[in-house]
Amino acid sequence: MTTRYIFVTGGVVSSLGKGIAAASLAAILEARGLNVTIMKLDPYINVDPGTMSPTQHGEVFVTEDGAETDLDLGHYERFIRTKMNRRNNFTTGRIYEEVLRKERRGDYLGATIQVIPHITNAIKEKVIAGGEGHDVAIVEIGGTVGDIESLPFLESIRQLGVELGRDRTLFMHLTLVPFLGAAGEVKTKPTQHSVKELRSIGIAPDVLICRGDRAIPANERAKISLFCNVEERAVISLKDVDSIYKIPALLRSQGLDDLVVKRFGLECREADLSEWENVIYQEANPNGEVVIGMVGKYIELPDAYKSVNEALKHAGLKNRVSVTIKYIDSQTVEAKGDEVLQGLDGILVPGGFGERGVEGKILAAKYARENELPYFGICLGMQVALIEFARNVAGMADAHSTEFNKATPFPVVGLITEWVDEEGNVEQRHEASDLGGTMRLGAQLCHLLEGSKAAQAYKGNTCVERHRHRYEVNNKYRERLEQAGLVFSGLSSDRKLVEMIELKDHPWFVAGQFHPEFTSTPRDGHPLFEGFVAAASAHQKRDLKK
């Protein structure tokens, strides 16, 4: 199979939405029957984002094969059916690490290792390998043109453009076309300078995606075409919209997919965007609203919970309600108590690391349990629910996780020292292990308890979900917790690790050690999120009747 490559770069400012634009184009091409994948090349020196602060970088998205990747890969999976893997995201740090490892082994036979050709060759090899087996591979280059960190990546794709030829490569550049209120007009000069910068390093864009808060007038598009040496039909206006799921149709209406298909000489059907039209209709026509309190510690940056936010919205679509997320700092719960939890239709406690704010999460779980408020715990959210139950129901007053208190008399949650990975291999860890790349990661099979809410949600006795954690339920206390009424509704493939818990006599109190948000999509949703939002809606209706 001959793979075609679309390289997506950004200019003027960061955070223009290259990932959404790339994913939207991929969705249109997929709707035309093409097999599409997307890659993200990140210019930072970290080997992966696994140890980066969520408040700086946003969430870490985990792929099926256990790669800790950029949150843009979450966008990719939500827009197309192709599942991402570790080949879909790599960083400057990983490239340098691999090149230096080869140098130490003597693979370069004494050569002087340089950015060109050794680093650029390593980048090109990964891009080609990531695109194998697909009709089209869209490659997003992180950062902004002009950043020193991005230069090796830009040089690599320039070389690929020459080596593969114009019939297999296309360069798409995303820029900002701002509107100046005082002048009453849009300004194209930033775009012109961005393209000039790109051309100075040898890349001439074939398509310009021009971002702005309004549609760009035809005369300004003609001006951009003239000064940037890009066909006028290839100057695409991408205005702000109230839903990212409207972007595929917006790009399709301007013929971006036709331009790509003709450039590559591909024969394929017209795009069928009916599934996306259905998503947009459901989003615009809810029959009600629910308020979900998300009790977390990284709430100053909502992107730290990007996949959870999107999964709640997807569940709202399936339940025909709009979901309003109320972000609640868990430290505020510690300081003010349950008064900040009033008026919610459900509580969700997401994952997290470190002791800060953990008692607030435990209080949130207690409030939900005692007030029969729907509760959904994810990763740490499951652990705090179990700790709360152990303390206040099972009679273990000082129960805790050894992550937060190594001297606790009741370590109901402890470090996982051994587990079986998705390929059946035994993994081992200890307290002195590195932080990076040492967690239980990736898709794992889970056995569900027959008759449990979990089994009802999944409509079966097994599920496969993605993990990212170091700590687990301590099996020493399982029997005591079960006797107190806690239901262990999900177990690992070898039945040695607890994957899900729930409360039997509660409208909806379910928690999982895994991260179900990573597999939720706008078209398909996710059974646990759907069940949670349905329970929140039912709780709201009961309150209204009272």
Swiss-Prot record:
ATP binds at S15, L16, G17, K18, G19, I20, D72, K239, D240, V241. Pfam families: CTP_synth_N (PF06418), GATase (PF00117). SUPFAM superfamilies: Class I glutamine amidotransferase-like, P-loop containing nucleoside triphosphate hydrolases. GO terms for cellular component: cytosol. One of its GO terms (biological process) is pyrimidine nucleobase biosynthetic process. InterPro entries: Class_I_gatase-like (IPR029062), CTP_synthase (IPR004468), CTP_synthase_N (IPR017456), GATASE (IPR017926), GATase1_CTP_Synthase (IPR033828), P-loop_NTPase (IPR027417). Residues 1-266 are annotated as: Amidoligase domain. It comes from the Bacteria. CTP binds at S14, D147, I148, E149, K187, T188, K189, P190, T191, Q192, K223. Keywords: ATP-binding, Glutamine amidotransferase, Ligase, Magnesium, Metal-binding, Nucleotide-binding, Pyrimidine biosynthesis. GO terms for molecular function: ATP binding; CTP synthase activity; glutaminase activity; identical protein binding; metal ion binding. It catalyses: UTP + L-glutamine + ATP + H2O = CTP + L-glutamate + ADP + phosphate + 2 H(+); L-glutamine + H2O = L-glutamate + NH4(+); UTP + NH4(+) + ATP = CTP + ADP + phosphate + 2 H(+). The keyword S-adenosyl-L-methionine does not apply. Residues 291-542 form the Glutamine amidotransferase type-1 domain. Pathway: Pyrimidine metabolism; CTP biosynthesis via de novo pathway; CTP from UDP: step 2/2. Gene3D superfamilies: 3.40.50.880, P-loop containing nucleotide triphosphate hydrolases (3.40.50.300). Allosterically activated by GTP, when glutamine is the substrate; GTP has no effect on the reaction when ammonia is the substrate. The allosteric effector GTP functions by stabilizing the protein conformation that binds the tetrahedral intermediate(s) formed during glutamine hydrolysis. Inhibited by the product CTP, via allosteric rather than competitive inhibition. L-glutamine binds at G352, L380, G381, M382, Q383, E403, R470. UTP binds at S14, K187, T188, K189, P190, T191, Q192, K223. The active site is at C379, H515, E517. CDD domains: CTPS_N, GATase1_CTP_Synthase. Homotetramer. Belongs to the CTP synthase family. Catalyzes the ATP-dependent amination of UTP to CTP with either L-glutamine or ammonia as the source of nitrogen. Regulates intracellular CTP levels through interactions with the four ribonucleotide triphosphates. CTPSs have evolved a hybrid strategy for distinguishing between UTP and CTP. The overlapping regions of the product feedback inhibitory and substrate sites recognize a common feature in both compounds, the triphosphate moiety. To differentiate isosteric substrate and product pyrimidine rings, an additional pocket far from the expected kinase/ligase catalytic site, specifically recognizes the cytosine and ribose portions of the product inhibitor. This is CTP synthase. It comes from Shewanella sp. (strain MR-4). The gene is pyrG.
